[in-house]
Amino acid sequence: MGKLDNKVALITGSDSGIGQATAIEFAKEGAKVVITYYSDEEGAQETLKKVEAAGSNGLVLQVDVTEEKEVERMFDKAIEKFERVDILMNNAAVNGQGIKVADMSTEVWDTAMKTNVYGYFFCTRRFINQVRKQGGKAKIINVSSVHEEIPAPGTAEYCATKGAVRNFTRVLALELAEEGINVNNIAPGMILTPMNEEAVEDKEVRKDQVQHIPMKRAGKPEEIGKLAVFLASSDSDYVTGSTYPMDGGLMQSMGQGA
């Protein structure tokens, strides 16, 4: 018997990396998974294959989370297929562009805000209203970053959005506590994902970055997935408003413990 039997989870950005790994871990625990992607349909279909190989069912949907109507359509399709959604993982995001504020275009700033903040808002609002309609307990898991606390020059737009996600999580936790909706936040550090490898292409630079991590290694996407299982299951029913750094001790080493 799995920890997520009879649950339906919707994970944005589940075509690769953390989202894909979490979809697989959820499926292993019995959850049906709504797999979403923006442009990588092949990756999303690969996630579906792995979800089915784990013995569960999935649904692949393309969505632009910055568009409110597309988010509404995504939820409508999910409900049409599975009749309910019990778990929302806000994971779809864009990375920092390595541009200092003085040189940053409004477009770069807006792209980060629309995806990393508005996307979370649109999905969360729709999810809350669906949970109220269907009844029962529910879980919201937001994915931020260690850069919610650790500043990185050249990524102001990214750091600002991740700080927003953390405080969004805390406010939601207080607003929804009496409704049986738990809201928590995962703050990944260096995780071996395609997105991070693309952001830092130089292997020597990545090797140097690892040396600043107390555990002296990067994390694996499935490690995030296993934490997400805890936050999505009844094991975490008395946990809300918390941030969980998954960073090998990086935030603690910089005096930035959550």
Predicted regions and their residues:
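Conserved glycine-rich cofactor-binding loop
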Residues: 8, 15-17
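Active-site loop immediately N-terminal to the catalytic Tyr-X3-Lys motif
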Residues: 102, 150-156, 178, 216, ...
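Active-site helix of classical SDR
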Residues: 124, 161, 169
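Alpha-helical segment proximal to the catalytic Tyr-Lys
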Residues: 129, 174-178, 237
